[in-house]
Regions:
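GHKL (Bergerat-fold) ATPase N-terminal catalytic module, capturing the glycine-rich phosphate-binding loop
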Residues: 1-184, 192, 199, 217-219, ...
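GHKL/Bergerat-fold ATPase module in large chromosome/replication-associated machines
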Residues: 117, 135-158, 178-181, 188-684
Length: 684
């Protein structure tokens, strides 16, 4: 065939510099594109064999070779697929593939970095010109009588095609790398890119360095394969003093190891996979030495094709990033990590792989957001996660409880972000009580209602005889509006005083220590209008205090007024809110409470950066509660002119606040100094 020269028809001037600009962040995608082309060629050749239109040669092993040559600054991609004729090169390379590149550019030209194209698919063969000054193709078609073809182009605008000298069916693409891309001629860099994009492609991929010194292994002669290159036969005699026959060994050229696992775990039936398989795959893909808690194997053929494995990692929230990594594949070809348009946001704390061949690739992120098919994929993934968790709750409760502390933040986040997921999970949510026993919300509500009913019964018995008809009617209306109160703890150490008081009276509370719990209890209150969540220090529970007898009320009010006056004076705060109660726990002299409403207001202020504002503007200062049954409080009432009143008042206030929240540096300094002063008084 005569030499043929031609010029590509270019609609946009300088197409390749423009393409480089848009895919700069992922300019290594040319490796994925060229290897994918090779895989496609091999797949098509195998299909022709299955259809009887071509017979594969005996011993045929599909493979793709990638050869780097730092000295010559080249990178070669060689496949043994179906190859191309001169007409096919003309049609594919100069028309179809180039058309794909121009379409790629059309899609990109109006995109911003915020609306990036997913995975940069569609550039295909012309991605080679992102890194190469010159590209050559040598190919031989499988068709009988086909002649080899050599095609070359510098810069991608002009090309030259003539008869080549390739003798085996398939295609070789040689890239003469530009000065900015010489890194890809480095074997280690090339391996890194291949492992990123091609680790699970359906064809074996072998990387080698041109002119590299061969490496050898010594194996038992019985293990030598027909494909091995034996360089030496070795006879090993038994060591001196040892019995046995001489061992026959063979020194062979080290066998090449494929970069690609052609049958990754997610492509297998879950019944074929063992626990060790799942753990080994997790460690290999995510380089995490810790074992995952458990996993979900996705396997769906209808109404769309989706396979994958999602792992629930064990996260040390104090040190580890909560962000996970979910790798998205298309027919075992890597697309990108954490595509939030496809994978529900709350699943981003997981690690895993999802392979969806039906996923639209050559689209922007904004297009994916409004794609009905993509939404169905996200819904399916969310549903399978909920099904797995509900199944564990029902059939493997022991392990479910064991994992709960690790997985609960993720599940709660899912409930907040996904209405359907929240609905599916509502009966499988667990809450840990003060005895570290796990309960459902239904159990907690029943228990709380039982406690309140018992308390109400006792109170009702005391006052029933003196009620008028109007009062009884009013009480009936109040009961109807009254909500079931569920108390919770956010810090078992900080709030230990309140916890001990609750336990002493047989009262329970649930433990909610994660940052997400603040939003989650609001979500629960919206879902369960009859329930109100109160932090354990939001109020003094009725069970923690004694009622003031009718004949003592007048005197008790005088005591209260006196203590309010004393504390406001000694603490220099006329707005200080002070309550006096007859607490059952006589070891507690003072405590602080902050209403749930005010505390949530404080949290909201912090969230919106208003933490420096005066909390009293929103009525969100804590109330000091004094125990009228405690000797120190009684001393203050009886000796309000004592020289020790000031130090006792300040100490009782700080002790109450310590159990409620951390003191500021200034407050802590004053507290420590005052504590030392008190001890010095004891020495006198």
């Amino acid at each position: 065939m005569a030499v043929k020269k031609g010029t590509l028809s270019i609609d946009s001037e300088n197409i390749f510099p423009i393409i480089k600009k848009w895919v700069y962040s992922d300019h290594d995608i040319f490796v994925r594109e060229l290897v994918s082309n090779g895989c496609d060629a091999i797949t098509k050749l195998k299909k022709l064999d299955m259809m009887g239109e071509y017979e594969l040669p005996e011993g045929y092993k599909p493979k793709i070779e990638v050869i780097v040559n730092p000295e010559e600054k080249t990178m070669k991609f060689i496949d043994n697929g179906l190859g191309m004729t001169a007409e096919e090169v003309e049609e594919y390379i100069t028309q179809i593939a180039f058309s794909g590149a121009t379409q790629f550019l059309e899609k990109y030209k109006d995109k911003t970095t915020e609306d990036d194209m997913i995975g940069h698919f569609g550039l295909g063969f012309y991605s080679a010109f992102m890194v190469a000054d010159e590209v050559q193709i040598d190919t031989l078609s499988y068709k009988e009588g086909a002649k080899p073809v050599h095609w070359a182009s510098e810069g991608g605008t002009e090309y030259e095609m003539q008869e080549g000298n390739k003798t085996t069916v398939g295609t070789k693409i040689t890239l003469y790398l530009n000065e900015d891309s010489l890194e890809f001629a480095n074997e280690y860099r090339a391996r890194e890119v291949l492992e990123r994009y091609c680790s699970f492609m359906p064809t074996e991929i072998f990387l080698s360095k041109a002119n590299a010194e061969p490496e050898y292994d010594t194996i038992d002669e019985d293990d030598v394969l027909d494909t091995d290159t034996v360089v030496e036969h070795i006879t090993e005699e038994p060591k001196e003093g040892e019995e046995g026959e001489p061992k026959k060994k063979a020194k062979i050229v080290r066998r090449p190891v494929s970069i690609s696992d052609t049958h990754p775990l997610w492509t297998k039936n879950p019944s074929e996979c063992t626990k060790d398989d799942y753990i080994d795959f997790y460690r290999k893909v995510f380089m995490d030495y810790k074992e995952p808690l458990f996993w979900i194997h996705l396997n769906m053929d209808y109404p769309f094709n989706l396979k994958g494995i999602l792992y629930f990692p064990k996260i040390n929230t104090e040190y580890d990033s909560i962000e996970g990594k979910i790798k998205l594949y298309n027919n075992q070809v890597f697309i990108a990590d954490n595509i939030k348009e496809v994978i529900p946001e709350f699943l981003m704390v997981l690690k895993g792989v999802i392979d969806c061949p039906d996923l639209p690739l050559n689209v922007s992120r904004s297009a994916l957001q409004n794609d009905g098919f993509v939404n169905k994929v996200a819904d399916y993934i969310s549903k399978k996660v909920a099904d797995k968790l509900n199944g564990m709750f029902k059939t493997d409760r022991e392990n479910y409880e064991k994992y709960w502390d690790d997985i609960s933040p993720f599940i709660k986040f899912g409930c907040l972000k996904d209405e359907k997921f929240g609905e599916k999970m509502k009966n499988s949510m667990l809450y840990k009580n003060l005895d570290h026993k796990y309960m459902t919300l239904e159990d907690i509500i029943k228990e709380a209602k039982g406690e309140e009913a018992e308390a109400a019964k006792t109170e009702e018995a005391k006052t029933e005889e003196t009620k008028t008809d109007a009062e009884e009617s009013k009480d009936a209306d109040a009961k109807e509006e009254e909500k079931t109160r569920i108390f919770y703890v956010t810090d078992e150490v900080q709030q230990s005083q309140y916890i001990n008081m609750f336990k002493a009276q047989g009262q329970d509370a649930i433990i909610l220590t994660h940052n997400i719990d603040s939003a989650f209890i609001t979500y629960l209150e919206q879902k369960h209008q009859e329930v109100q969540f109160l932090r354990i220090d939001a109020d003094v529970h009725d069970s923690l205090k004694d009622e003031v007898a009718e004949d003592e009320k007048e005197e008790f009010q005088k005591t209260t007024d006196s203590l309010v006056e004393i504390f406001r004076k000694e603490l220099g705060n006329e707005k200080l809110d002070v309550k006096v109660e007859k607490l059952k726990d006589e070891n507690v002299a003072s405590m602080a409470v902050l209403s749930e409403e005010n505390r949530r207001m404080q949290e909201m202020m912090k969230m919106y950066g208003m933490g420096g504002m005066d909390a009293s503007m929103f009525g969100s200062q804590a109330t000091l509660v004094l125990n009228a049954n405690h000797p120190l409080v009684q001393f203050l009432v009886a000796n309000k002119d004592s020289e020790n009143v000031s130090i006792i008042c300040k100490q009782l206030y700080d002790l109450a606040m310590l159990a409620h929240k951390p003191l500021s540096p200034e407050e802590m300094t004053a507290f420590v100094k005052r504590s030392n002063d008190i001890m010095m008084l004891l020495t006198k």
